[in-house]
């Protein structure tokens, strides 16, 4: 019923006006913040240099109680010169992270925002308190309460992360050096997910614990050579690299709890389910580089690398890639250029080929073992993704050219880069027909082309001993085109949303496009074709929009006064589109302003005039009773009775009415729950934004202060 201010009994039992609640959704939100505080101390002597730092990060979410993150990081770096020929670099970083209530996004049943689309518009947040009774059961609101979800659905995880590496540099001769490096990346994580008993949709409750351990070893050896002969400078290197990654996770879960409000595996009302997860990959490589320079104005570079990855089939496990580049420093070539106005100018160009592998366990399909069917009957379930043992490594070839300039004693700088990239055998996952027994498939997708440019401008408008103001502006534009797809396909579907729109990769179009699955059918004049009931017919899937922006950019400014520096950064995106499932779901649930269309007219016809028959809605009389099709219009057809589609005409399948203007009205519940979703443009939004991404304040402690405490 319309909310026209009538006095009604509220959900708390008190009288209230039936009017939309101001700040209906915004009252749940708050401004989210992320605070970063860091301090570092450096000291250097003739043989030892050391830097010690600490960073504290605290952040929250736009919803109170979600994504409460605390991260403390300690890092130390030291270089020790043992002899004239030998030095050692030591790096270490320890991070402890604690996150309470990571948020769930989109249409997850744990996302409080998703439930807002089911809430009556006269409801206030205050009416949701208390959210449960003395027995722990939710109050009878007849919908999922976001307040319940914020208070009765929790999760937490803690992570310890260690990064460490040691590098040994040994000068074999004046021109020949050896570098050995070993690095460790290790983290340990444990946490839980909890859904209390009596949660709507899961009255039994849910609890899960997990522990994770991951480590990655990296070893590298490189021999480098640098030599100068008169006007020539030569540098070359050869090396090898090995990575060894291992991940293990143990999960324990109960799907039925014995009692509410008790977060523990011992609170088990049925059977504990436990299962492991495993991930591992090894990768080895050999590589070489060479660079030749002449008189500091021309440089030529060549690189080559061969990788072997355990994630690929044995026949395709090895892949080689290389790069070639040349650059000209014009200011070194033409010495007569005044340095006061052009201090540096370089033209560069390069060609490169880069290879890439995939993740763990993407080659062979397996089955999961279960024993809970009909008591203790064992059964096996296949994976949802169809894998393939014929995967090839991805390959990207690129051409790049650019210009770098610095002016006015480096007070201004300009950089321009143009690139053109072709990626072949891109490894992607696509949804497939369920008749195959799988929901999605992994394969090499074909060829994709990217080209575009990036421009960077930097200026220092003001600088003296105590003050300095810097401004850096960046702008980039990327274009893409799908040149071909695997097995001659015209398109592949990445995902489908609400059976209404799809994200597709389509031959001849930008890399990712939005498509409407069953759009309104139209004729050659663009008029919507409807059936006898006035509802639009479904046509063939059509292109909606590209998700790619027209251009992106950023503006960073910094102001220094003595040792104090303030900086801020704007992030810019212009163009591209998003399809809002929130807007779609809100309209389908009759909660959006958009879905008010036709509602009052329908209620007047249905409740006041009692037009329960369909004649008034159809707007026409049965053609078989009216020989002249032009005289069969219902006498009250023009009065709005719901929703209609402007300019729509009857389809050729409607006897006696083909091509005539549609006289029918659609009941709002039919239109907004079924028909509107087929008109993808209704929920399409511009993805452009300008946002303040970062604000920072830094202070360099004067050296004479540190000397007093021994640094």
Model regions: which residues?
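Surface-exposed, extracytoplasmic segments of Gram-negative outer-membrane nutrient-acquisition systems
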Residues: 5-17, 377-384, 422-445, 480-547, ...
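Residues embedded in well-ordered regular secondary structure
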Residues: 1-66, 103-106, 131-156, 169-171, ...
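Hydrophobic/aromatic-rich, well-ordered segments within soluble, folded domains that form packed cores
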Residues: 41-54, 558-561, 689-701
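Extracellular/periplasmic, surface-exposed regions of secreted and cell-surface proteins
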Residues: 35, 77-86, 91-96, 137-195, ...
């Amino acid at each position: 019923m319309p909310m026209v201010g009538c006095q009604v009994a509220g959900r708390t039992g008190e009288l209230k006006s039936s009017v939309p609640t101001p700040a209906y959704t915004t009252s749940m939100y708050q401004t989210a913040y992320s605070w970063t505080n860091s301090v570092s101390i450096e000291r250097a002597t003739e043989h030892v240099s050391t830097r010690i730092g600490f960073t504290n990060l605290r952040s929250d979410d736009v919803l109170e109680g979600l994504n409460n993150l605390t991260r403390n990081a300690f890092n130390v770096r030291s270089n020790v010169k043992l002899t004239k020929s030998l030095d050692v670099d030591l790096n270490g970083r320890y991070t402890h992270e604690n996150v309470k209530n990571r948020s769930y996004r989109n249409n997850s049943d744990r996302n409080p925002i998703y439930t807002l689309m089911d809430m009556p518009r006269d409801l206030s947040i205050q009416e949701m308190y208390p959210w449960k009774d003395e027995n722990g059961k939710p109050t009878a609101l007849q919908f999922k309460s976001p307040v319940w979800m914020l208070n009765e659905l929790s999760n937490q995880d803690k992570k310890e992360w260690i990064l460490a590496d040691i590098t040994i540099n040994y000068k074999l001769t004046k021109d020949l050096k050896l570098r050995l490096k070993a690095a460790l990346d290790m983290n340990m994580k444990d946490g839980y997910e909890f859904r209390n008993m009596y949660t709507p949709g899961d009255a039994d409750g849910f609890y899960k614990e997990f522990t994770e351990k991951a480590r990655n070893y990296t070893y590298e050896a490189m021999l480098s050579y640098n030599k100068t002969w008169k006007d020539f400078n030569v540098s070359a290197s050869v090396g090898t690299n090995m990575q060894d990654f291992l991940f293990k996770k143990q999960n324990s879960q109960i799907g039925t709890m014995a009692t509410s409000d008790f977060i523990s595996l011992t609170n088990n009302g049925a059977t504990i389910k436990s299962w492991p997860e495993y991930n591992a990959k090894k990768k080895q490589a050999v590589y070489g580089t060479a660079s030749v320079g002449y008189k500091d104005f021309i440089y030529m570079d060549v690189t080559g690398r061969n990788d072997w990855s355990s994630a690929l089939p044995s026949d395709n496990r090895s892949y080689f890639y290389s790069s070639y580049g040349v650059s000209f420093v014009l200011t070194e070539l033409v010495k007569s250029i005044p340095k006061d106005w052009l201090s540096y100018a370089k033209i560069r160009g390069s060609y490169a080929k880069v290879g890439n592998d995939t993740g763990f366990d993407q080659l062979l399909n397996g089955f999961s073992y279960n024993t809970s069917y009909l008591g203790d009957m064992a059964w096996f379930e296949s994976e949802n993704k169809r894998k393939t043992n014929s995967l090839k490594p991805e390959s990207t070839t690129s051409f790049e050219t650019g210009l770098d300039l610095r002016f006015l004693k480096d007070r201004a700088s300009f950089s321009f880069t143009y690139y053109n990239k072709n990626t072949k055998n891109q490894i992607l996952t696509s949804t497939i027909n369920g008749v195959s027994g799988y929901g999605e498939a992994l394969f090499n997708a074909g060829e994709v082309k990217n080209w575009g440019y990036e421009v960077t401008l930097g200026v220092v408008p003001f600088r003296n001993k105590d003050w300095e103001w810097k401004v850096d502006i960046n702008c980039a534009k990327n274009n893409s085109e799908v040149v071909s797809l695997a097995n001659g396909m015209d398109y592949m579907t990445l995902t489908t949303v609400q059976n209404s729109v799809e994200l597709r990769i389509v031959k001849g179009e930008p890399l990712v496009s939005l498509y409407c699955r069953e759009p309104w059918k139209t004729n050659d004049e663009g008029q919507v074709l409807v059936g006898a009931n006035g509802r639009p017919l479904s046509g063939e899937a059509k292109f909606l929009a590209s998700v790619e922006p027209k251009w992106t950019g950023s503006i960073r400014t910094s102001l220094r006064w003595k040792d104090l520096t303030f900086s801020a950064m704007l992030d810019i995106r212009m163009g591209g589109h998003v399809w809002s499932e929130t807007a779609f779901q809100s309209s389908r649930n009759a909660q959006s302003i958009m879905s008010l269309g036709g509602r009052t007219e329908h209620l007047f016809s249905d409740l006041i005039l009692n037009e329960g028959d369909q004649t008034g809605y159809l707007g026409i009389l049965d053609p078989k009773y009216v020989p002249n099709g032009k005289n069969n219009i219902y006498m009250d057809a023009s009065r709005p009775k719901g929703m209609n589609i402007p300019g729509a005409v009857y389809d050729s399948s409607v006897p006696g009415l083909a091509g005539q203007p549609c006289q029918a009205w659609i009941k709002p519940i039919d239109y907004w729950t079924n028909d509107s979703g087929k008109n993808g443009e209704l929920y399409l939004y511009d993805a452009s934004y300008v946002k303040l991404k970062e604000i920072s304040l830094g202070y360099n402690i004067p050296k004479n202060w540190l000397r007093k405490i021994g640094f």
